[in-house]
């Protein structure tokens, strides 16, 4: 989630035509989903201009709550249905008004379900937006069971017109967001769902080459390629990366050829496999997941 905020902040600093077409919105969670730096640079939208109340009253605040007609963040109350109604409307601006916007909404991941009806209709109309669900999983467990999201990956997979990603590392997220903004404009594209977390994850020191970037966008890659005779491979998605890396270290002596497969989009992997595997007899090319697993012997255990 922190990386998401930094990426948006960099867009704001560049002040390009692209960044001027980004519109962010959130249901009362803008600061806690790392939109703060973006808002400080781009301001809040309102038809009536108003100054920063905190500054006027000399109250210390890291945020600049300045409202104007040129602001690029729309602050909502705790109303997730309104969030998706807004994303749907802004995501159709190119069809309605001939001007492309890039709507980005942030929401606590467990509360995506509050706005499913509006999200479904937005996707049905082919609205183009990016929804960022964060924090996800059990990151918000101290706030109660209702704040834990376990089933939201199923929403991402099952919703037509919405492509879901769950990256573990910042460089993956950057590549996915760059691709995502092009996907929003593609005639055959759609909307993007990013499932992120506030959990700290050790970042790999690497440069993403073209092949690795393509694998990330297709939905998966080998974080650690298996040896010639792997007894096991470990498959993970998202913030489980820390546990998987530790487990691989513990198991290294016993299973030297073990591989680690990182899944960035189970949605993409499944949909491509389904399209290419309608009939195994007529299959002319392998899906990405089949390409990844072709180096794994049939009797290898998958964890």
PLM regions and their residue ranges:
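Thiamine diphosphate
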Residues: 34-154, 157, 164, 172-178, 245, 261, ...
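General beta-strand structural signal in soluble alpha/beta enzymes
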Residues: 25-26, 105, 131-133, 164-168, ...
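Conserved acidic/glycine
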Residues: 1-80, 88-89, 231-240, 246, ...
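Hydrophobic helix-cap positions at the C-terminus of alpha-helices
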Residues: 11-15, 90, 94, 122, ...
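Short coil/turn connectors at secondary-structure junctions
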Residues: 18-22, 68-71, 96-102, 125-129, ...
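Residue-level signal for short, function-critical loop segments
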Residues: 28-30, 107-110, 135, 198, ...
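Short, charged N-terminal helix-start/capping segments
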Residues: 2-20, 98, 104, 157-175
